[in-house]
Amino acid sequence: MNEILRKSYAELKSSLSLGKISATELATACIERIKEVDGSVKAFLSLDEKRILDAASESDARRKSGNPLSEFDGMPIAIKDNICIRDSITSCASKILENYKSPFHATVIEKLIAKGFVLIPRANMDEFAMGSSTENSAFQTTRNPFDLERIPGGSSGGSAAAVAASMVPLALGSDTGGSVRQPASLCGLYGLKPTYGTVSRYGLVAYASSLDQIGPFSKELQGCIDLYSVISGKDERDSTSLNHPGFSAPWTPDFKGLKIGTIKMTSEIQPEVVKAYEKVLNQLKEKGATLVELDFSKFDFAIPIYYIIATAECSSNLSRFDGIRFGSRKDKTGKLEDLFVDSRTTGFGSEVKRRILLGTFSLSAGYYDAYYGTAQKARVLIRKEYDSFFSKVDFILQPTSPTTAFKVGEKTKDPIQMYKADIWTTSVNLAGIPAISVPMGTDEKGLPIGLQITAPHFQEGKLFGAAQAIGALEDLNIKFPENIG
């Protein structure tokens, strides 16, 4: 591996600013690393070397003339394949969009380009972001760099694996029910799900519009802080975008007097995850924090509520992919109805079809009130329960995932078990609050374990402060693999 990629994110940012390395050198190192290990990891669906190197060359020219766009000018970043980049294929890892080239940039892409970031698309994902393992991609299964027989998490598995394998220092993903936090946990990274509405969704191909949110990955907390500061902000093109106070610097917590909400561990949780969680809690208690065990019994139905709402929105959002408005066309008989059926049957994978059917059922005339209407009422109760929690505690700490990375193929035939991987993440999306996954050590096999920190709406600054303090605790650092494959 090129020595440049052994530098931390902070060192890379400093080296670019001081001229110790050029953007072209850094981009070339990333390309070489991708060629070296991605045959095994399969984090990227394509690699446009010319476009990457051209962007890096432009960055170098700006720095040489003394006019860098920002301190980030020349920094490479991987982009998930559901975030639109003009004149680049945005397939959402689906055959139905296999040849779709976006005619416009997503808002987050415009913001990254305005700061001089070097974009490296297209990071693999579960098809249309529907999955928790990146096994639902129509093109390839991404592997966990820590163990190639295991999954990296999903749906943003390609983004997470690319950072964990040191192919890129940063990445963007999307999080609908845990799709940034869960792969961050399984790949030993920091992964942020911002408050809903603080980051524009314009140009993010929608899965479930009331739940989707774009978020960053990094090996270091500072990478997430920097990316959030760049991509957040109100956007008139996104009707759900909000004005928010932002933050000037991460809040520095004093553990003495800090009230931290915790969750009771059960026998269903991997013992090593429980051990790591309790170790963190004990360290926080020793530093003066007060631990408050919260009653999460009302969240037992969070996953079914999530899957009713998410699949309902998915069935609506994906109706546009019919072979006429969007998507590849399969016209065997010349009949309009057959065109719709054939295009969608051949274009969508099995998990996408399953969720479309579930959503269509819950929205049907005879069942709308019983399912979708009831789920929306229950969603309000979840939001109120979080409000109640945060009147008692400053933060809530939970393991991000109940297990470390499982083996490829282990849960593909049991969707219920796969859905349970998001047991602690979906409720955060239902409530629209921010959460971040931070590394919490490893299990006996060396597989990463993640800790989810949750805060009230718009409290990203405090969330980063808590993540910074917890990240400084003993024995939580992750050693990332260099020799892969």
Curated annotation (Swiss-Prot):
Q: Which GO BP terms sit in this record? A: translation
> PANTHER family annotated for this entry?
GLUTAMYL-TRNA(GLN) AMIDOTRANSFERASE SUBUNIT A, TRANSAMIDASE
Q: Which domain of life is it from?
A: Bacteria
Protein purpose: Allows the formation of correctly charged Gln-tRNA(Gln) through the transamidation of misacylated Glu-tRNA(Gln) in organisms which lack glutaminyl-tRNA synthetase. The reaction takes place in the presence of glutamine and ATP through an activated gamma-phospho-Glu-tRNA(Gln).
User: Which residues carry out catalysis?
Assistant: K80, S155, S179
**What organism is this sequence from?**
Leptospira borgpetersenii serovar Hardjo-bovis (strain JB197)
The organism's taxonomic lineage, starting at the top:
Bacteria, Pseudomonadati, Spirochaetota, Spirochaetia, Leptospirales
Q: Which PROSITE patterns does UniProt cross-reference here? A: AMIDASES (PS00571)
What protein is this chain from?
Glutamyl-tRNA(Gln) amidotransferase subunit A
Name the HAMAP family for this protein: GatA
- List the keywords (alphabetical): ATP-binding, Ligase, Nucleotide-binding, Protein biosynthesis
Which family does the similarity line name? Belongs to the amidase family. GatA subfamily.
Gene for this protein?
A: gatA
